[in-house]
Swiss-Prot record:
The lineage of its organism: Eukaryota, Metazoa, Chordata, Craniata, Vertebrata. Residues 264-306, 366-387 are annotated as: Disordered. It is found in: Secreted. The gene is FETUB. Residues 272-299 have a biased composition (Polar residues). This is Fetuin-B.
Length: 387
């Protein structure tokens, strides 16, 4: 009995002296795949798209066609979640300077369609009422001309970014001259052409969209008026057309213009946040601008977004060496390539004077997305759905 007791005591002593094996380093929590058609996901997609449109200074408002992928990365307790969304989008007829919500804008008719994809990283902290877009990238391209001809052979031939044809500039200048001649007092000048197309309707016809700015001149001053200041900003957008029917020596010119809301949009800082009501907004914006300034620390740099435009897919195929090239949208958005993730400083979003960081992961590929993704499309034409 004494021998048995001695063995037990020795065993316990050896166990107490032993050290536990080293534990593996903590790994970030895995991404959760979300249902692309759930109201929860669609609400977040709406906020993301509103912020993307609000951040842009050029181009047209983008509308949601469908959610292609949605992931959630839950952070430590009290820090909310980071979301990784891939959105299929369509261009609308509203210019971004109009500050119109995408839900109030009509998408372009089929032969004028511009479609594409946006990837976005979005931060939500419901407890602190913070909705914040740190990064996004979008890639767009016009609908294939061969698809238009096959579907609607009589539709106008769109060349949305082609300014090489001098007739487009002629259409813009002459239609604006017509508008100024009919304006009772104010005069306007051309800023830039934003969209072009042409069609044969009993003769050539040209269509343009262009931004205008207000001239300090009034009609009564005529040629005695000095040139407008170079710093003036666009105040509206015009749609002009010029037609030359066969057998008619004259030109048929038409023009309509709409003006942007003169009231400046609500300040939201250098990067947009939604539904955040800090106690001292000016301090929050100041901190936000400091945080977005270039620094030597990648964890404190908050990137902006961009929108790139690709040529018509037909032109892409013409220059390809492949027999049947597959259409792709090279939308890249990676704040890090480290599979373990890196920290992103979001302290400036919080009212409390403390350091707050979230873990950002490499943007996920679509291979791991939910079976409920992509969601149903608002416009299901195969020609305007990114593959």
């Amino acid at each position: 009995m004494n021998v048995l007791l001695l063995l037990v005591l020795c065993t316990l002593a050896m166990g107490c002296g032993a050290t536990s094996p080293p534990q593996p380093a903590a790994r970030p929590s895995s991404l959760l795949s979300l249902d692309c058609n759930s109201s929860y996901v669609l609400d977040i997609a709406n906020d993301i798209l509103q912020d993307i449109n609000r951040d842009r200074k050029d181009g047209y408002v983008l509308s949601l066609n469908r959610v292609s992928d949605a992931r959630e990365h839950r952070q430590e307790a009290g820090l909310g979640s980071l979301f990784y969304f891939t959105l299929d989008v369509l261009e609308t007829g509203c210019h971004v300077l109009s500050r119109t919500s995408w839900k109030n804008c009509e998408v372009r008719i089929f032969h004028e369609s511009v479609y594409g994809q946006c990837k976005a990283i979005f931060y939500i902290n419901k407890e602190k009422r913070i909705f914040y877009l740190p990064a996004y990238n979008c890639t767009l391209r016009p609908v294939s001309q061969s698809a238009i001809i096959m579907t609607c052979p009589d539709c106008p031939s769109t060349s949305p970014y082609d300014l090489s044809n001098p007739r487009f500039m002629e259409t813009a200048t002459e239609s604006l001259a017509k508008y100024n001649s009919e304006s009772p007092s104010k005069q306007y000048s051309l800023v830039k052409i934003t969209k072009t197309s042409s069609q044969w309707v009993f003769g050539p016809a040209y269509f343009v969209e262009y931004l205008i700015k207000e001239s300090p001149c009034v009609k009564s001053e005529g040629s005695s008026c000095a040139l407008e200041s170079p710093g003036s900003v666009p105040v509206g957008i015009c749609h002009g057309s010029l037609g030359e029917p066969q057998g008619n020596q004259g030109k048929i010119i038409s023009v309509t213009c709409s003006f942007f809301n003169s009231q400046a949009p609500t300040p939201r800082g250098e990067n947009a946040t939604v539904n955040q009501r800090p106690a001292n907004p000016s301090k929050t914006e100041e901190l936000q601008q400091q945080n977005t300034a270039p620094t030597n620390s990648p964890t404190k740099a908050v990137p902006k977004g961009s929108v790139q435009y690709l040529p018509d897919w037909d032109k892409k195929r013409e220059g390809s060496q492949e027999k049947d090239p597959v259409e792709t949208f090279p939308v890249q958005l990676d704040l890090t390539t480290n599979p373990q993730g890196e920290s992103l400083d979001v302290s400036f979003l919080f009212q409390e004077p403390m350091e707050e960081k979230v873990v950002v992961l490499p943007f996920p590929s679509k291979e791991q997305r939910s079976a409920e993704c992509p969601g149903p499309a608002q416009k299901g034409y195969p020609f305007i759905l990114p593959s």
